[in-house]
Amino acid sequence: MKSKISVLLSFLCLVIFMPVLVNANQNPGSDENGPQKLENPMSVQYLKSQLLKSQPRMVLNSTIEKSLLGKLKSDPVVQNLYKAIQLSAEKIQKKPLLVRKLEGRRLLGVSREMLLRVNMLGMVYRIEKSPKILNRINEEVVAVCNFQDWNPSHYLDVAEMSMAVALALDWTAGKLPKSTIELAKTSLIEKGIKPSYNEKGNTGWIKGTNNWNQVCNGGMIAASIAIAEKDPELAAKTISRSLNGMPYALQEYAPDGVYPEGSTYWGYGTSFSVVTSAILESAFGTDFGIAEYPAFKKSAMFRVLMNTPSTWYYNYADCGDKRSEGGDVTLAWFATKTGNKPFLKRTVFFSRIWTLANFPEFRVLPWFGFRNTRKKQVKQFPEPGRVMDQTRS
């Protein structure tokens, strides 16, 4: 089944991203038997000393929230997007709670819906601290944590559900009932993390070279941070394993940023890598080299050049045919990291509220980090068609 653009994090909307880039002199080097490594100092001692103690600490933290609130007062695009989030949250509250219903062998649709719901409800809760929203988040978490499992035979399902539950815990910052917090942490351990240590199970993604690596390792990192105080040994071991495993997928961007699975899967896999980068930066003050990994930033231009004037893709492999009209939120993150503001299409995100709230891809919302973009001269992008013609000549 072809994966759709990731149902990720609405917290990407509105966030003033505070990058803490890895020192250029701290080159972790390459393993002659594998890809260039990320920095990996992770241990129980490192986890206990370096992990931010207060919540939220995943993508959002107190510093980022302060900047976010400032944007909500001053930026009309951010204001427009937040209204769309509010509308989505209202619609979610009218829906029934999720049930464990497989489609074929997959639970992925349920996991993605849970991730969407946590993003929308969680962002509204962070801004408004509404008891009604908090109660609905509690109900959503209890419902999915009472599933018999999260379908580990198809680990994407586990990964996206784990990220959803981890964010629900983090963004409610201890305000859920103690029984729910304990249930959620136990579920993250037993249904999320531990099945990934089953050698007979579906664990090839750990050092895989496609989007499964990016999605599943990202989900395990989020889950590990959420349960760090409950089981620091398991958390540190799992984060360390993911930091060792992720380069096997990140190396696929080399040498020029071209993604082997095409533009559609670039959107899915890359969106999880940028979310993972953001989670690590907000929680530890560093992403251990993800954003600076060779050719990773170059891939943003690949994404741009795969877009045709007709709104279709120059596609290959099992890439889809047509891109979303809802804006490219992953490219918006690259705008904050590279200074290339054209990667962030503000006019697209200033669409009608109803349109934004009903786009499936609105589940992942843009990063607004203009204050943090480095000042640099931005090259004009050639038209994709002309580039392709020039390439042939």
Name these PLM-found stretches.
Residues 9-19:
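Bacterial N-terminal signal peptides
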Residues 57-73, 78-312, 319-320:
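Aromatic-lined, polymer-binding surfaces characteristic
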Residues 1-9:
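Bacterial N-terminal signal peptides that target proteins for export
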Residues 6, 47-50, 115-117:
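Short hydrophobic/aromatic segments of transmembrane alpha-helices and their interfaces
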Residues 25-83:
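Extreme N-terminal leader/anchor segments
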Residues 204, 227, 268-393:
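Carbohydrate-active enzyme catalytic cores, enriched for enzymes
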